[in-house]
Amino acid sequence: MIGRRSLELKTAPQLLAMQRAGVVLSEALDAALAGAPGFTTAELDAVFAVVLAERGATSNFLGYYDFPASICTSVNEEVVHGIP
């Protein structure tokens, strides 16, 4: 809480929205486990895109400053903001 003097309590609707988002993410991560060696980051992105669409969810990344994918993913030595 750097720079804050109080704790913001979430409302019941905010907590429900957070719970729903967590469930969608959990389902997307479970679906991604279907990936095997040789599974590309583009294929992983496609899995996430399908799960999000089926649940009526959207990606925070897709379209943000023209980012072309639903997920940011990096492999090996890449650290951040990898494009599948």
From Swiss-Prot:
Pfam families (UniProt xref): Peptidase_M24
Domain of life: Bacteria
GO molecular function, one term: metalloaminopeptidase activity
A single GO cellular-component term on record: cytosol
Gene3D superfamilies, alphabetized: Creatinase/methionine aminopeptidase superfamily
InterPro entries: Creatinase/aminopeptidase-like (IPR036005), Pept_M24 (IPR000994)
SUPFAM superfamilies recorded: Creatinase/aminopeptidase
Name of the protein in question: Uncharacterized protein in adk 3'region
Source species: Micrococcus luteus
